[in-house]
Swiss-Prot record:
Positions with biased composition (Polar residues): 819-842, 850-889
Alphabetical list of InterPro entries matching this protein: LOTUS-like, OST-HTH/LOTUS_dom, SNase_OB-fold_sf, TDRD5_LOTUS_2, Tudor, Tudor_domain_containing
Protein name: Tudor domain-containing protein 5
Organism: Homo sapiens
In-chain residues carrying the UniProt-annotated modification Phosphoserine: 892
GO terms of biological process kind: P granule organization; spermatid development; transposable element silencing by piRNA-mediated DNA methylation
One Pfam family, short name: OST-HTH
Location(s) in or outside the cell: Cytoplasm
Family classification: Belongs to the TDRD5 family.
Limits of the HTH OST-type domain: 7-80, 127-202, 295-369
Annotated Basic residues bias: 98-108
Gene Ontology annotations for the cellular component aspect, listed alphabetically: chromatoid body; pi-body; synapse
Region (Disordered): 98-118, 808-908
Length: 981
């Protein structure tokens, strides 16, 4: 028996004993108090997984019987078992002590005390009661400030209103029933901290959420109270939304009959009066259906009487005070179920009219009868009026409507509207008028193909630039097909936050009905590969999509370039994408888990399910390995726990995958890769900068770095086999003189053949065989590495012939007593770059020779090996001005013209000088030499990138994982692993 089962069994006995000893039973509050007095601890609800006492006792039907009590209370009585039947019969024969019961009620303040006439009907059956409007307004007032966790709800309610929230007073058994009854104003979102109660900002019909996998926008979509522009489609006061199959409510059909009977009376009215009458009819129907229908007609007349006394308008903040002065009674919006007076006025749009005038910070309320509405001229003004009628619940104010609505409607659309409005059946069939008007406008727009000027008719998004090898990034796994085929999204300020900002702007723009209708895509533009945007019906956010396939029945299959998944949407929901929303590259990156392959030919369902559980909806740390056929092969690590969890290790341990030392091309992406099909590539920012400056890109040096001798390849494979297979630790280390550690300093090597003079590198040479013998003698944690291409620093120019300038790097001889005793030969490294042809090729350019000198402190005497004329090098420190990477080659390789000549040497860099001198000389033909000495500051000596040393152990990143971004500020320290051409 587990610990939890033992606690539950003991709790059942204790609760039965408490309830049996009480003849009349106990309420849930009394049970909690009696248990605390008897045991000394509270009920172990959280340990057993319960959230309330009622939930606990309902899970014990053989121990507790729930009985309704007086005043809507709940009484808990015990159900005796075989061993307690005798005790229960003795307790039942006892006399009931009325004095004790009365003293118990007097001793504690009861929420049910009061006259019998005010007691509620006992709660019977399983049908939850209705939450009173006063309580609902209190809940809205509490959650309007900020969301509240369910565990902190009682504390927050007591702090706000000075009393505890007694839900049983209203006939509810638990908070679950309260939240279900208030589901129209409160939404519950599951978070890591628990259930989060949030105030719904809209009040339309709630629908199940079905957005692309991994997105963080989880608020449900509901209609706003008082916002009638998004109510029933037929009852909208604007003529802009196309409607196909409409089933009008019964109330609207009755209004149709009323309007038919009044055809004779209204036939003499002019065109403008007919439109005004139609608009007022719609408003009255909406008011009866909406929240205003709950207000009594007597109260409406009183409010209208107060407002009518101010023909020039009454400030909305003074409405309650004027009402109290006239009728000598208070008007409380909260008792009517409204959050404030503004929401109350917005619900009474059939009798009140609201305006906002410049120069006033408050809204003006008018009597709808005495303040006639201005004549209807366009859809724009009608939409503005609908927005003004309910300002607190509408996300767009009047000023926002004026800014976001398309301000320049075409003349071609105005003329058909005027012609259609002249039809004689305008008043007789108002619903048909709206449908025909919308259809005519839509057909006209499609016929003329009048698209907005800032819409994107034919354009492709750019992909994110390739990531640097061995860089650490924070990622979200958005869409998973298999461990070899999934999409990630980078978690950083330059990617995820920009995407969120763009989606908020898109929602703000396209949520305006006039703007949304203006950007409707005609049928002729709906073609595969077209970039557009869509709002899925279950969500309230707008997404960038690319049309993948055109299906039957007015449906299309679209690809989400920011999340990686494919979905089916309606053609009518597609909208043109504004040009400003195409600047952000597609955020989804196709990936494959590095170094793994399935045990069988394909991934099993268990392996895919395990990989989905590992990813979850949380930020992970990704270690970039390489790109294979344009697909990023990446290691994934979960750092949320105390120990780092590498996904490829977990899949191998559970028998789902085989770990190999190479990356296999993904079969799924080779069959279909929508991102590569519909987007264009974008070069890395560093390569673009280098190309603009006239220098070769990093890829050029990387390609040159591949050209190594066969002997060097074999040597490197020997080193690679000796490197431990564990993943490296994730601590970041800066390279500086003050914290230098020579145990893991990379051994530098010289460059072999190079096609371009700019690709020659300056390093000290290494003895081929001695180099590796030294590595074996070193401790296991000290490994030989070569600097990769990602250590390039744009602030330094590559050596060689750059823009007609010759660059030489010298190491001056430093005279000292220690050098004479050790007999160490100092070398001078010089690059010969066909100087004779430079003057003829570039006669107008003056030759310069740059000499880079570095002051160093000499080390102790070196150790020479027997039978070897060359001295074994240990660690070599390059200047921080080293422009590019180096490659280890054999010393016996052929040295062509233009290569680096050097001799063996020993440099033990225990301490470096705190200054670096850069000397510039003019051409040797000039007798005068101008020298400029630059002393680099301490900040310049430290490398501008963070490096991570390799080790067999791993360390938890913790919060540092959130700092890993796509800027490649974190790098593994260089490895000898190479990519074959």
């Amino acid at each position: 028996m587990s610990e939890q089962e033992r606690i539950q069994e003991c709790l059942r006995k204790e609760i039965r004993s408490l309830l049996i000893s009480t003849k009349d039973g106990l309420s849930p509050q009394e049970l909690e108090k009696e248990y605390l007095l008897m045991v000394g601890n509270h009920l172990p609800l959280r340990i057993l997984g319960y959230r309330s006492t009622m939930e606990l006792v309902l899970d014990m039907p053989d121990v507790v019987r729930v009985c309704p009590g007086a005043g809507g209370t709940v009484i808990l009585k015990a159900i005796p078992d075989e061993s307690t039947k005798g005790i229960a019969s003795l307790v039942a024969k006892q006399r009931s002590s009325h004095k004790l019961r009365n003293s118990m009620h007097k001793g504690r303040p009861s929420i049910y005390s009061g006259p019998r006439s005010h007691r509620r009907v006992p709660y019977r059956g399983r049908v939850a009661p209705i939450l009173p409007a006063v309580v609902k307004s209190e809940l809205k007032d509490l959650l309007a400030l900020s969301p509240v966790l369910l565990s902190d709800f009682e504390k927050a309610f007591a702090k706000r209103f000075g009393r505890s929230f007694q839900y049983m007073q209203y006939g509810f058994l638990s908070m679950f029933e309260v939240l279900n009854a208030a589901s129209d104003v409160i939404s519950v979102e599951q978070t890591r901290a628990g259930s989060l109660l949030m105030l719904k900002k809209s009040v339309t019909e709630e629908k199940p959420r079905g957005c692309p996998a991994g997105k963080i926008f989880t608020q449900p979509f509901r209609m706003k109270q008082g916002s009638y522009s998004t109510g029933f489609p037929v009852a909208k006061p604007c003529f802009s939304q196309p409607t196909s199959n409409m089933e009008p409510p019964k109330q609207i059909m009755s209004m149709e009959k009323t309007s038919k009977l009044n055809v004779v009376e209204t036939s003499r009215l002019n065109h403008t009066e007919k439109l005004n009458q139609l608009e007022n009819t719609f408003k009255s129907v909406i008011a009866q259906i909406g929240p205003g229908g709950t207000i009594s007609s007597e109260l409406k007349h009183k409010i209208k009487f107060v407002v009518s006394k101010f023909p020039e308008g009454l400030f909305i903040s003074k409405l309650l005070g004027e009402y109290e002065v006239i009728f000598k009674e208070q008007l409380s919006p909260k008792k009517l179920g409204f959050l404030n007076v503004t929401e109350l006025v917005g619900a009474l749009s059939d009798i009140l009219h609201v305006e906002f005038r410049k120069g006033h910070q408050d809204l003006l309320v008018f009597d709808a009868d005495k303040k006639p509405l201005p004549p209807v001229q366009s859809d724009k003004k009608i939409e503005a009026k609908a927005c003004v009628s309910s300002p607190p619940r509408n996300s767009l104010s009047t000023a926002a409507v004026k800014e976001t609505v398309w301000n320049c409607p075409s003349k071609k659309q105005k003329e058909p509207q005027q012609k259609i409005c002249k039809k004689p059946n305008l008043v007789v069939k108002p619903l048909q008028l709206q449908v025909e008007t919308n259809k005519s406008e839509l057909n006209l727009a499609m016929a003329n193909h009048d698209i907005p000027p800032d819409a994107v008719p034919n354009k492709k998004l750019c992909r994110l630039p390739p990531l640097d090898t061995s860089s650490l990034i924070g990622v979200f796994v958005e869409y998973i097909i298999s461990p070899s085929q999934f999409y990630i999204r980078i978690y950083s300020r330059d990617s995820s936050e920009l995407l969120e900002d763009m989606m908020i702007e898109m929602r703000r723009c396209y949520s305006n009905q006039l703007v949304s209708d203006r950007y409707v895509m005609p049928e002729c533009f709906i073609q595969p590969g077209h970039l557009c945007c869509v709002r899925i019906s279950e969500d309230k956010w707008w997404y960038r999509v690319i049309i993948h396939r055109v299906l039957e029945k007015q449906e299309v299959e679209v690809f989400y370039p920011d999340f990686g998944n494919i979905g089916i949407v309606q053609k009518s929901s597609l909208r043109f994408l504004k040009c400003c929303y195409t600047k952000l590259p597609a955020q989804a990156i196709p990936c494959s888990l590095a170094w793994v392959r399935p045990v069988e030919e394909h991934w099993t369902s268990k392996a895919i399910l395990q990989f989905q559980k590992l990813c979850g909806l949380k930020p992970l740390v990704g270690v970039v390995d390489e790109y294979v056929d344009g697909i990023l092969n990446i290691f994934l690590c979960d750092t949320s726990s105390n120990e780092d969890v590498y996904f490829h290790h977990v899949l191998r341990t559970e028998g789902h995958a085989i770990v190999c030392r190479e990356n296999i091309s993904s079969k799924g992406f080779s069959e279909l890769n929508p991102l590569a099909l519909y987007t264009t590539s974008s070069g890395g920012p560093e390569d673009i900068v280098l190309t603009e400056l006239g220098y070769p890109s990093q890829q050029h040096y990387f390609n040159e770095d591949r050209k190594i001798s066969p002997q060097s390849k074999e040597s490197e494979l020997r080193i690679l086999d000796e490197i431990p297979t564990g993943m490296p630790c994730l601590e970041s280390v800066t390279i500086g003189d003050d914290i230098w550690d020579e145990n893991w300093l990379p051994l530098q090597a010289k460059m072999g053949k190079g096609g371009d003079a700019a690709s020659h590198l300056f390093t000290a040479s290494l003895g081929g065989k001695n180099q590796y013998s030294s590595c074996k003698e070193m401790p296991q944690k000290d490994w030989c590495f070569s600097t990769p291409k990602d250590t390039w620093d744009d602030s330094w120019q590559p050596s060689g012939l750059v823009n007609g300038t010759k660059v030489e790097v010298h190491k001056p001889e430093v005279l000292g007593a220690q050098e004479k005793n050790t007999g160490t030969n100092r070398t001078q490294k010089q690059l010969d770059i066909n100087g004779s042809s430079d003057s003829s090729t570039l006669p107008k350019l003056e030759e310069f020779c740059t000499s880079l000198t570095q002051s160093e402190q000499s080390a102790d005497g070196s150790q020479s090996e027997p039978n070897n004329s060359q001295t074994q090098p240990k660690q070599i420190q390059l200047s921080t001005a080293a422009p590019c990477s180096t490659t280890a080659v054999d010393d016996s390789a052929e040295k062509p013209s233009g290569s680096v000549e050097s001799s063996p040497e020993i440099l033990k860099n225990e301490d470096f000088s705190s200054s670096r001198a850069i000397t510039l000389y003019k051409d040797k033909r000039q007798e005068s030499v101008d020298q400029l000495s630059l002393i680099l500051s301490y900040e310049c000596q430290i490398s501008q990138k963070l490096y991570i040393p390799r080790s067999t152990a791993t360390a938890a990143l913790g919060a540092a994982a959130r700092l890993a971004t796509s800027r490649s500020l974190l790098h593994w320290y260089p490895s000898v692993k190479r990519m074959e051409a």
